[in-house]
């Protein structure tokens, strides 16, 4: 039998079970169900699943490693017993097992009954693969349906504690299950490059990385390579006990080259030297801020953050905005200074870490291996601060972040001293932006080269023609013009239509752009909230392409760009309040609600389940239309409230402009 790729989902009730499968590479749909009155497909289902397991078929799901595959394996492993049981008995036992799984996962020490390596079917979990089980990226299938503009954000209309007694209930449950399968299939297709990479890595290194998140890939492969260097099995490397630290004296970990010339930065260094850190509480261990040359800079135990007042900063014939970033800043701080977790062989760790960096430079960026080495380089820093990682050592984390802040501050100061008329705009973790006279670019580059020599780090430089700066985390940058041949220019316009394009006397030119924070709108990670994307698009087009918001917004015919998404949770319910013929009705919504602001509709708010406190979703007198189910119709019939969106866009533009309005120039 030929190996196949399936996407699947299950539904479990006390008297009903179903599994729906759809081919990834085709539209083959298979449904099995167990019900005491309608159908009992148990025998056929088990035969099919075991046959597919022998063929090496792969089963994709959403959170399937923790739930769906567990129930399936339970049904397979109990085949001998279940073949002689009635459908109602099979359903009830599957339902009881399902409930035990769901409630068990609330306990910290809970382990699923069937480890992945013992399961009959080869599984890939797109939930874990995309790291949506991480609190910072936490996302349900319904939330991802919203963020990828799925046509139907469908919740079950039947309680999972109910009994399925009618044909209508069965059809409704199957419809719900099919929608989940088809939306999961879209996630699989969107993740195909990530899946292919994990398949290749699993095959190459004989490690199961099929559902591995990026940090897990980094952890497993670092252990693999380090194990080879130390002649140890990766499991033994990961089992090495981490070094217990009771405190970290910052004065003992500051690099010798960190020195300053001016009183304000000398004081910053002295402030750091007095700090003693509790390794168990690094988040709130230290905070310090300074105001220098119009920039408030915040220091802590993470990255440096500094920003001038909001405004639109533009290069002129006399002035240029320089942007400089440290190449692989955090990895190279560890590599160049031969830092390692305290419990690992320092030389072996440093050599291996540097090997990843040097090997990556030899590999083309399009090669997936380049991406893998980048993952390892960047994730290692984060893993040094992860108690569950074999690389855990908070002192290493603090060495990197504190010396990173101080090293970048040295560059900031050196530029300010060498070019007194320079205007600092921003410092952010691994780089800085500065306005300098065009005739001082050579001096700027000399200062940067001197800093590189002192720190043994490398800088990458570019130029902006415009920086729209709301704050350090939210900005739009327009790079300087770059010239390419006509064919490349045409291809660039097709692949990056939002860039700026011109035909200048010097040739065919384009200006790339970069959007951060609330101004991002392109290629957003699926876990991110994309609410009312039309706002960030309109702001971008106003500042970058000189298109008025009222003109842009009327040309955008993508209804999803006008939609927002709101989550209900264990604390707050989402409610829709409608008034019809003077009578008010309140409807509790499901976990995820997609909506847009309309001229007619209902109010939406969140209500605290215990106190009854009301929080408006969109403050004011605005009303919304719920849009969980896509409805195609002439665009004007959506009845969009353009006034709301224009007010939000205008507010964003005014916020980004600030009080500065290019007055520097």
Where are these regions (language model features)?
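Entry/capping segment at the start of metal-dependent catalytic domains
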Residues: 1-20, 27-29
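Two-metal-ion RNase H-like nuclease active-site motif
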Residues: 3-12, 123-126, 322-324
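Short catalytic/ligand-binding loop motif for oxyanion handling, primarily in non-cytosolic enzymes
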Residues: 16, 67-71, 132, 331-332, ...
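Conserved DEDDh/DEDDy metal-dependent 3′-5′ exonuclease domain
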Residues: 29-142
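Helical catalytic core of nucleic-acid polymerases
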Residues: 137-138, 158-168, 288-413, 417-420, ...
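Glycine-rich, acidic and aromatic/proline-enriched surface loops and short helix-turn segments
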Residues: 143-154, 378-383
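Conserved "right-hand" nucleotidyltransferase catalytic core of DNA-directed polymerases
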Residues: 147-155, 161-327, 414-439, 443-452, ...
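C-terminal, non-catalytic extensions of nucleic-acid polymerases
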Residues: 243, 249, 286, 292, ...
């Amino acid at each position: 039998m030929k190996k196949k790729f399936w996407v699947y989902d299950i539904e479990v009730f006390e008297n009903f079970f179903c599994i729906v499968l759809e081919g990834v590479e085709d539209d083959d749909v298979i449904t099995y169900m167990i019900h005491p009155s309608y159908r009992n497909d148990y025998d056929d289902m088990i035969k099919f699943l075991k046959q597919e397991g022998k063929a090496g078929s792969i089963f994709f799901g959403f959170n399937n490693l923790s739930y769906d595959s567990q129930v399936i394996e339970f049904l397979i492993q109990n085949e001998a017993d279940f073949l002689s049981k009635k459908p109602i008995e099979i359903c009830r036992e599957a339902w009881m097992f399902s409930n035990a799984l769901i409630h068990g996962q609330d306990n910290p020490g809970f382990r699923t009954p069937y480890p992945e390596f013992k399961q009959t079917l080869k599984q890939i979990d797109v939930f874990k693969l995309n790291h949506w089980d991480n609190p910072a990226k936490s996302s349900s299938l319904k939330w991802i349906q919203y963020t990828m503009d799925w046509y139907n954000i469908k919740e079950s209309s039947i309680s999972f504690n109910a009994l399925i007694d009618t044909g209508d209930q069965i059809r409704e449950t199957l419809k719900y299950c099919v929608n989940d399968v088809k939306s999961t299939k879209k996630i699989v297709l969107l993740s195909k490059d990530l899946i292919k990479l994990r398949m290749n890595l699993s095959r190459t290194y004989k490690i199961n990385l099929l559902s591995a998140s990026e940090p897990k890939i980094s952890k497993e492969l670092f252990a693999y390579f380090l194990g080879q260097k130390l002649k140890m099995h990766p499991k033994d490397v990961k089992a090495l006990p981490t070094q217990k630290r009771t405190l970290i004296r910052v004065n003992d970990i500051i690099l010798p080259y960190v020195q300053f010339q001016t009183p304000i930065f000398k004081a910053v260094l002295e402030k750091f030297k007095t700090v003693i850190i509790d390794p168990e509480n690094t988040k709130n261990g230290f905070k310090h801020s300074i105001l220098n040359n119009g920039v408030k800079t915040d220091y802590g135990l993470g990255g440096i953050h500094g920003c001038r007042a909001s405004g639109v900063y533009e290069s002129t014939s006399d002035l240029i905005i320089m942007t400089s970033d440290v190449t692989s800043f955090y990895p190279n701080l560890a590599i160049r200074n031969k830092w390692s977790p305290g419990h690992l062989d320092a030389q072996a760790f440093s050599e291996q870490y540097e090997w990843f960096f040097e090997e990556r430079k030899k590999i083309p960026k399009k090669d997936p291996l380049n991406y893998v080495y980048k993952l390892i380089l960047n994730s290692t820093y984060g893993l040094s601060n992860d108690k569950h990682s074999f690389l855990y050592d908070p002192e290493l984390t603090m060495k990197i972040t504190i010396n990173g802040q101080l090293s970048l501050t040295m560059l900031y100061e050196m530029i300010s001293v060498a070019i007194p008329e320079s205007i600092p705009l921003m410092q952010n973790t691994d780089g800085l932006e500065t306005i300098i006279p065009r005739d001082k670019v050579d001096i700027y580059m000399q200062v940067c080269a001197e800093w590189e020599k002192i720190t043994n780090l490398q800088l990458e430089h570019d130029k902006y023609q415009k920086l729209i700066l709301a704050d350090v985390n939210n900005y739009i940058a327009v790079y300087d013009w770059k010239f390419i041949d006509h064919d490349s220019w045409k291809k660039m316009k097709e692949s990056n239509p939002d860039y700026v394009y011109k035909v200048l006397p010097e040739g065919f030119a384009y200006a790339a752009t970069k959007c951060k924070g609330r101004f991002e709108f392109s290629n957003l990670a699926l876990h991110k909230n994309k609410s009312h994307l039309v706002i960030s698009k309109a702001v971008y087009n106003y500042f970058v392409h000189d298109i008025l918001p009222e003109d842009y917004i009327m040309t955008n015919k993508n209804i999803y760009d006008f939609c927002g998404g709101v989550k209900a949770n264990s604390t707050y319910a989402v409610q829709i309040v409608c008034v019809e013929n003077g009578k008010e009705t309140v409807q509790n919504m499901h976990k995820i609600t997609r909506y847009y602001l309309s001229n007619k509709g209902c109010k939406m708010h969140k209500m605290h389940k215990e106190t009854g406190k009301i929080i408006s979703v969109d403050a004011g007198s605005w009303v919304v239309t719920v849009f969980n189910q896509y409805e195609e119709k002439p665009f004007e019939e959506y009845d969009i409230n353009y006034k709301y969106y224009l007010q939000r866009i205008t507010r964003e533009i005014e916020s980004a402009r600030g009080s500065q309005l290019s007055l520097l120039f």
